[in-house]
Amino acid sequence: MFNDHLAGAGNALTGIVGMAPEARPWANFVTMQLLVVAIIVVLFAILRPRLSPDRPGKLQHTFELVYGFLHEQAEEQIGHEGHHYLAFFGTIFIFILFANLIGVVPGFEAPTMVPSVPAGCAIAAFFYYNIVGVQANGLGRYLAHFAGPMPLLAPLMIPIELVSHMARPLSLTIRLFANMYAGEQVTMVFLKLTFLFVPAVFMGLHVFVSFLQAYIFMLLTMMYVAGAVAHEH
């Protein structure tokens, strides 16, 4: 879509910064990500000046419900300090949710259908929970938990823990990518084979899966953070 209509402008921009653009420099999933970010920024720009504790609008009510839900989940998974990490949880949840839902719009495709996008989110979550784990416990205590509770078991536990932690980004990536890709393909197949009301059912299912996968990704990230910041280390 972008390359069909705005490739010339894209080439000009990449030329200004000294890059040598290819014939089609903008992949669809890149432009979809940028569009998702732009939509989120515009929504918050609209919401910010309209915030009111006395007369909240529908958009404010919606985001207050989302905030309350995220806060409750963070407190449940991490404890009383869970609210300290809400900024990251909220960012990852809202981005993945909007990235999933944009695929419902005709002519658009969800960027989470491309493995590199879920992988980017998973890598961000991986680095985040390790960083906050070090901040909460100190580098020495955080690394010590990889050895397990007994020094004699350290040669066995360290490889197991390392493999377990390295598998987490892969698990997050495959789960999000596979579910979104499969849902999109099922919707497209039925859209081509049947009347409109039948694909509408699958589009509703696609919306449900979009919310569910964003929630699961966020919930697993919360669990990883909870394990990383636990003071039993």
From Swiss-Prot:
<keyword id="KW-0813">Transport</keyword>
<feature type="transmembrane region" description="Helical">
    <location>
        <begin position="143"/>
        <end position="163"/>
    </location>
</feature>
<keyword id="KW-1003">Cell membrane</keyword>
<feature type="transmembrane region" description="Helical">
    <location>
        <begin position="27"/>
        <end position="47"/>
    </location>
</feature>
<keyword id="KW-0472">Membrane</keyword>
<feature type="transmembrane region" description="Helical">
    <location>
        <begin position="210"/>
        <end position="230"/>
    </location>
</feature>
<dbReference type="InterPro" id="IPR023011">
    <property type="entry name" value="ATP_synth_F0_asu_AS"/>
</dbReference>
<dbReference type="InterPro" id="IPR045082">
    <property type="entry name" value="ATP_syn_F0_a_bact/chloroplast"/>
</dbReference>
<keyword id="KW-1133">Transmembrane helix</keyword>
<keyword id="KW-0406">Ion transport</keyword>
<dbReference type="InterPro" id="IPR000568">
    <property type="entry name" value="ATP_synth_F0_asu"/>
</dbReference>
<dbReference type="GO" id="GO:0042777">
    <property type="term" value="P:proton motive force-driven plasma membrane ATP synthesis"/>
</dbReference>
<dbReference type="GO" id="GO:0045259">
    <property type="term" value="C:proton-transporting ATP synthase complex"/>
</dbReference>
<keyword id="KW-0138">CF(0)</keyword>
<dbReference type="GO" id="GO:0046933">
    <property type="term" value="F:proton-transporting ATP synthase activity, rotational mechanism"/>
</dbReference>
<dbReference type="Pfam" id="PF00119">
    <property type="entry name" value="ATP-synt_A"/>
</dbReference>
<keyword id="KW-0812">Transmembrane</keyword>
<feature type="transmembrane region" description="Helical">
    <location>
        <begin position="114"/>
        <end position="134"/>
    </location>
</feature>
<feature type="transmembrane region" description="Helical">
    <location>
        <begin position="85"/>
        <end position="105"/>
    </location>
</feature>
<dbReference type="InterPro" id="IPR035908">
    <property type="entry name" value="F0_ATP_A_sf"/>
</dbReference>
<keyword id="KW-0066">ATP synthesis</keyword>
<comment type="subunit">
    <text>F-type ATPases have 2 components, CF(1) - the catalytic core - and CF(0) - the membrane proton channel. CF(1) has five subunits: alpha(3), beta(3), gamma(1), delta(1), epsilon(1). CF(0) has three main subunits: a(1), b(2) and c(9-12). The alpha and beta chains form an alternating ring which encloses part of the gamma chain. CF(1) is attached to CF(0) by a central stalk formed by the gamma and epsilon chains, while a peripheral stalk is formed by the delta and b chains.</text>
</comment>
<comment type="similarity">
    <text>Belongs to the ATPase A chain family.</text>
</comment>
<dbReference type="GO" id="GO:0005886">
    <property type="term" value="C:plasma membrane"/>
</dbReference>
<comment type="function">
    <text>Key component of the proton channel; it plays a direct role in the translocation of protons across the membrane.</text>
</comment>
<feature type="transmembrane region" description="Helical">
    <location>
        <begin position="189"/>
        <end position="209"/>
    </location>
</feature>
<protein>
    <recommendedName>
        <fullName>ATP synthase subunit a</fullName>
    </recommendedName>
</protein>
<keyword id="KW-0997">Cell inner membrane</keyword>
<keyword id="KW-0375">Hydrogen ion transport</keyword>
